[in-house]
Amino acid sequence: KVDKLTFTVTGNGVNQTVKTNAKGEIQIDNLMPGVYTVTEMDYDKYEPQESRRVTVVSGQVSTVTFNNKLKRGDLQIVKSSEDNLNEGVTFHLYGTSLSGIAVDEYAVTDENGVATFEDVLISGSTPYTVEEVDTAVRYVVPEAQSAPINWNEVTNRSFLNILKKFSVTVTKSDAETDTAQGDASLAGAVYGIYKGETLMDTY
């Protein structure tokens, strides 16, 4: 967007505020020869611009150029897990920036479990959302988190993958009577937990 941006031109007794047209241009006619200062109003979504000085020469058109850059920041995700398998995990960052542009980006963790979103447009009043993508089935899926992005700052978030746990209750009974017969006892039986054909533990 380049229209309706406000500039102030000062110098040689002139102090005039003007707005850009649809082409992003302003034009002030009939200025006396001399040096003038052109200043752009600060906008939350743009990096601040330095004022520029321009020399007006009689009979010539003097030009000064401004190039607005949208403010950006970074987001760093640190992933940890109970089994320390933290590389190659994908995170998704999404939302609407302060400038109204949609943000929809992905980053993958490195060997240290760190995923970095660089040069992200700053967020508005509503922060972005960051979530882990395609969480491995062995983990409890971590909740998504809010992630505001501020200009020239690094926002930090951490995600912990917790292994799914389970419990097994075994009740031994007699196949015919459901209770022990005669002097027999159902106590003291040993059970094994297997992964495939591998015995993992006994109880």
Stretches found by the model and what they are:
Residues 1-203:
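Solvent-exposed loop/turn and edge beta-strand elements of beta-rich ligand-binding domains
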